[in-house]
Amino acid sequence: MKSYLFITAALSASPMLSSSAYSQIGKRFPSERKIVKDPITGTMLTFLTSTPTGDSKIYQTHNQWTSDGQWLIFRSGRVSGDAMAVNENTGEMIQITEGGYMGMLNVARKSMKLYFMRNTDITRQRSGGSLQIIEVDLAKVFADSKAGTMKPASVYQRVCGTTPPELGAGGDMALDGAENWAYFRVGPEEAAKHLLTGTKIEGDFGPRNMGAGPSGIAGMNIKTGEIKYVVSVPFQIGHIQTNPWIPGEIVFCWETGGKSPQRTWTVMADGTGLRPLYPESEYEWVTHEAVISRDEVAMAIMGHRKIPGTSGTVAPGTAVNGANPGQDAAWGSSGTREKPTGLAIVNLRTREMSIAGQTPGGSGLWHVSGSPDGRWAVGDDFSRSIYLIDRHTREMILLSAGHKETAADHPHPTMSPDGTKIQIQSAMLSADNRSMNICIIPVPETWLKRIYNK
């Protein structure tokens, strides 16, 4: 793939866009922290938020915790259009952005910083023109908010740079493992310029009319504002993520909203090494890949559909946020348990794949994560139940349930960096059975104390 550089001015301090439509950075909210016993499994759950204000966690492809391990970053209707942090120990909540954001929130692992994209024109809600990448100094926000000495937003928010409008940049963004570059999606017009002549452009795939290309990935140096082009592909890119342990290693997917002809991909930041991460068969429905350790990516090989020509019933299909999505006949014959399914883990170096576990029935595991030390894997299913797997013994338990199939979204479990707990979003406490809260589920103490024979 071709590679080239754009240069933009790095702005260390720039007047923020008008924020009259937004509340103030540093605003504090009282603790809602509650300990609730899971009514089905008995697990003690820590709800860091507990009122129906429309909370949602960061997607499981990305980091959730600040580098000091004390705060989780999330989205909330409390500050519509901006982001919040909640202290895991005290439950105190603070607004951490002002002026809005778009796309993915990127929480640094090596510093107390947050990165995200923002439209240069705040009246424009979609990508397509120039976007800014913003850095937030979280340590300064937390300290000044606590002391009651908050200053203007520009003291805490720095513009790293602005993308050229011709890139058609989108908000699907990921922070490099070295935390000096941020990678983001590029629109079809620019992406087409970097494809080899004669490359076949893919059309939409499946009933959701998604997946058509081309698209690409570019990066911005968050210290200097330099822009570099990484790669173009002939299909729609989604779920851009990075390997936190290997600088320059990128994982992304062919996004169709369901089954893809070839879901998972990887490439290096210099544009080399582009390849399918897990070469899949037409009968495999691969989804929700997430880098979980230095050498591993977890993903779900779905088993949610009825095997054609067999007895048994399947619940009526629903939209993607419902209790039984992906049942449209137009997806083809994939996603059944006629072939192996489950929570799969691919080694980026050896390219070997193993299945860590699978539920005995139902949809099978869906959104997945794992601990960096290789001990645990975790996944949810269509019922919003959470399953924990011991990767050494292959034992699997139902860890938590009762999070309501009617919830506005899926739990999206994410394992903590130290492998002791899992963050989800849950409607368990909501009277309307939809509004979600931020919840922490502990790995059982008896599991944490396990010792394995070498």
Predicted segments — roles?
Residues 24-46, 209-215:
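Blade/loop signatures of beta-propeller domains
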Residues 410-454:
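Blade-level signature of beta-propeller repeat domains, shared across WD40, Kelch, NHL, RCC1
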Residues 25-27, 119-138, 184-212, 255-258, ...:
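Short, conserved, GDST-rich strand-edge loop motifs in beta-rich repeat architectures
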Residues 62-71, 105-113, 117-118, 172-181, ...:
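Blade-terminus and WD-like Trp-Asp/Gly-His loop motifs, strongest in beta-propeller folds
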Residues 36-56, 85-101, 138-168, 220-236, ...:
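Multi-bladed beta-propeller domains
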Residues 59-62, 79-121:
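Blade-loop segments of beta-propeller domains
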Residues 300-312, 318-344, 350-395:
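Loop/turn-rich, solvent-exposed surfaces of beta-rich toroidal or solenoidal domains
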Residues 100-104, 108-112, 116-208, 214-215, ...:
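Asp-box/WD-like beta-propeller blade repeats and closely related beta-sheet repeat scaffolds
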